[in-house]
Amino acid sequence: MRTLSSQLYSNGGLTWFQKKNQSSLFIKHLRVSKPSRVQLISAVQFRPCIDIHKGKVKQIVGSTLRDLKEDGSVLVTNFESDKSAEEYAKMYKEDGLTGGHVIMLGADPLSQAAAIGALHAYPGGLQVGGGINSENCMSYIEEGASHVIVTSYVFNNGKIDLERLKDIVSIVGKQRLILDLSCRKKDGRYAIVTDRWQKFSDVILDEKSLEFLGGFSDEFLVHGVDVEGKKLGIDEELVALLGNYSPIPVTYAGGVTVMDDVERIKDAGKGRVDVTVGSALDIFGGNLPYKDVVAWHHKQHSLH
């Protein structure tokens, strides 16, 4: 495994990965292995989503989400459903869609209850994220989540917090952990963003960081935050980066508007990047027929 820049990774004021032997000892202790890109040669999948805000299934412009203690007046909502999270989960199960994600866009009890309802409706078929940490991660697995999704918890002061990452891997296992590496462009590079996508970290999404983080997680989830929720088209450059360098399965979300965008993700990602569609779908108030995306998904699998 390559040694990463010591500027990226810190813990408790100590710098990690300054020397190759330090990296080797840490990796050996965690018992993680360097992933192989061979894992990614499979059919591209459509990964459905259920975004929950204050107990309701919504589609929002994620970059406008602020802490719930604020008045929320800046929140831009594209859609609010009259269907429950549980109903969406049942639909995804009936349509044979796996690996979708349930995201709680707030830590309120209503959102937590809605997420758990979805997990109960489709045990083992959905991943869950939003406020996940070492204390609550196993409870969501026990409620039926296939994986837990974490982002802000494993970042601290703009760096990767290795103690937290090590801790959560030891609890749920690499095979049930997904790292959300959602990012925004900054100075021409993609920087991972945390805290409801409001804070830039110092961690740049590139070949080295993807390779390193792939040793700790089963999959990546990456929202192109600059285009997410805006239905302006995909971030093709980001998709290409993921297709070229992700050593484990990765799902891209952001900007899909028409079926051609889904095909562009397949092509730009070299068949290695799965796709999530949100606001554009007719089940979320958009114009893109959900049934067409499901049919496309099953067609990909029939080709393999």
Curated annotation (Swiss-Prot):
Pathway: Amino-acid biosynthesis; L-histidine biosynthesis; L-histidine from 5-phospho-alpha-D-ribose 1-diphosphate: step 4/9. It is an enzyme of class 5 (isomerase). It comes from Arabidopsis thaliana (Mouse-ear cress). It is found in: Plastid, Chloroplast. Its cofactor is Na(+). This is 1-(5-phosphoribosyl)-5-[(5-phosphoribosylamino)methylideneamino] imidazole-4-carboxamide isomerase HISN3, chloroplastic. Belongs to the HisA/HisF family. PANTHER family: 1-(5-PHOSPHORIBOSYL)-5-[(5-PHOSPHORIBOSYLAMINO)METHYLIDENEAMINO] IMIDAZOLE-4-CARBOXAMIDE ISOMERASE (PTHR43090:SF2). Residues 1-61 form a transit peptide. Binds 2 sodium ions to optimize substrate binding.
